[in-house]
């Protein structure tokens, strides 16, 4: 939980020379996507339209990850996590409530991948510092990385796609999704406590609060806080999300360039994620034009009202757990009528809250597993899969139910 070398810690992101299986998947998708265009399986005009659509999304993804990485390097997450433990005054239930709120807020504001990649190591280290069970804090991060990702367009890439399709600004989008988000959070909180925190609490029900983490560079720490607030203010003011994240990242990059330029490396940019997303869009669009759309349209059906919303959300959740939530969203979105907002938002719930039953259903879950393995943490697998499947079903149904009540 401490910085090293007298300055901010170096952002944790694997270099290209250390290839990870996800690197190979990203490159394979990019090559496959380029091959689809080169061979004519995907017409160039369609590919150009797709790339034009996702360019603002790629700008957001690239800059928000840089913002999150440098925010972590400045010690913001470490400081906040230890302060949560201090504020809880040794109370296990109080720590639970504060950790749930912290993970949910991180997901809502800085997106689910930030929670999975950057908050997970902090929570794991906090558990070691407190000498408590690691599993409750680990599961809190991955569950809320997924189920807290409904409220704002920036919380999840699928949200950005949906908001762009229906033409909603962030506040209007939040006006639709705030009740479904509350429902998903309520179910998550109850299941987290019952299956994980209640069972693994300390024998005395209390723990010894740690000392507050001191950032290595207070100036960079304050700069990171200002950059995050600037990002949130830009979103609330209605600025394009890519521009808001780029401006905030630029401010923090300037701070690091002036004080610790050695921290800035090309590996800060999430090359793997950008390549993965670009290739995935092209490949899914190609498969859709060659038969997938017909199958997905049959699964999603044409029903309206509650049956249609439940079927769209269920199809999204099913396909997400079979493959992954991003291609699942793209495949179902392609067969929904342009003006069918209710089923689109139900699909969004299914592909955001539903991808928990299996580890590969969400990129955030894969990234979380990677961080847990790097820290030598093994979450009880059978218990995790069973409880995650329960959350996927109950959380999705609760969120879609509230959507139907308010739309």
Across the structure, where does each feature detected by a protein language model lie?
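Hydrophobic transmembrane alpha-helices of multi-pass small-molecule transporters
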Residues: 1-71, 179-181, 189-288, 387-407
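Hydrophobic alpha-helical transmembrane segments
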Residues: 27, 58-59, 93-101, 115, ...
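Short, amphipathic, aromatic/basic-enriched membrane-interface segments that mark the entry/exit
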Residues: 32, 82-92, 108-110, 209-220, ...
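Membrane-embedded alpha-helical segments and adjacent helix-loop junctions characteristic
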Residues: 44, 48-132, 271-341
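Helix-loop-helix module between adjacent transmembrane segments
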Residues: 68-69, 102-111, 144-151, 180-188, ...
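Re-entrant/interfacial helical elements at transmembrane boundaries that shape
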Residues: 80-81, 114-125, 138, 152-166, ...
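Membrane-core helix-loop-helix motifs of multi-pass transport proteins
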Residues: 130-199, 203-212, 344-347, 368-398
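Hydrophobic multi-pass inner-membrane translocation pores used for secretion
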Residues: 241, 306-309, 339-345, 358, ...
């Amino acid at each position: 939980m401490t910085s090293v070398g007298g300055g901010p810690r170096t952002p944790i992101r694997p270099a290209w020379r250390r290839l990870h299986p996800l690197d190979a998947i990203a490159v394979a998708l990019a090559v496959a996507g380029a091959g689809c265009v080169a061979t004519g399986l995907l017409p160039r005009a369609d590919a150009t339209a797709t790339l034009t659509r996702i360019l603002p999304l790629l700008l957001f993804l690239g800059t928000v990850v840089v913002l999150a990485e440098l925010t972590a390097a400045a010690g913001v997450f470490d400081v906040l996590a230890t302060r949560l433990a201090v504020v809880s005054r040794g109370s296990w239930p109080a720590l639970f409530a504060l950790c749930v709120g912290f993970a949910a807020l991180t997901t809502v504001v800085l997106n689910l991948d930030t929670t999975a990649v950057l908050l997970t190591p902090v929570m794991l280290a906090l558990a070691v510092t407190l000498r408590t069970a690691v599993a409750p804090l680990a599961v809190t991060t991955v569950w809320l990385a997924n189920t807290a990702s409904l409220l704002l367009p920036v919380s999840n890439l699928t949200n950005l796609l949906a908001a762009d399709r229906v033409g909603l600004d962030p506040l209007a989008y939040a006006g639709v999704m705030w009740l479904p988000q509350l429902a998903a959070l309520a179910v998550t909180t109850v299941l987290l406590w019952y299956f994980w925190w209640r069972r693994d609490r300390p024998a005395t029900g209390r723990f010894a609060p740690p000392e507050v983490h001191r950032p290595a560079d207070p100036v960079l720490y304050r700069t990171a806080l200002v950059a995050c607030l600037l990002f949130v203010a830009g979103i609330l003011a209605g600025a394009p999300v890519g521009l808001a994240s780029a401006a905030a990242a630029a401010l923090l990059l300037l701070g690091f360039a002036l004080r610790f330029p050695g921290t800035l490396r090309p590996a800060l940019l999430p090359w793997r994620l950008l390549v993965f997303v670009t290739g995935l869009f092209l490949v899914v669009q190609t498969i859709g034009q060659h038969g997938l759309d017909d199958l997905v349209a049959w699964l999603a059906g044409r029903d309206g009202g509650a049956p249609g919303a439940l079927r769209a959300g269920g199809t999204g959740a099913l396909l997400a757990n079979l493959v992954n939530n991003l291609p699942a969203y793209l495949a179902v979105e392609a067969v929904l009528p342009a003006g069918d907002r209710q089923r689109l938002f139900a699909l969004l719930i299914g592909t955001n809250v539903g991808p928990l039953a299996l580890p590969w259903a969400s990129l955030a879950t894969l990234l979380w597993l990677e961080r847990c393995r790097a820290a030598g943490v093994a979450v009880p697998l059978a218990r995790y899969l069973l409880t995650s499947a329960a959350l996927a079903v109950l959380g999705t149904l609760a969120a879609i139910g509230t959507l139907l009540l308010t739309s």
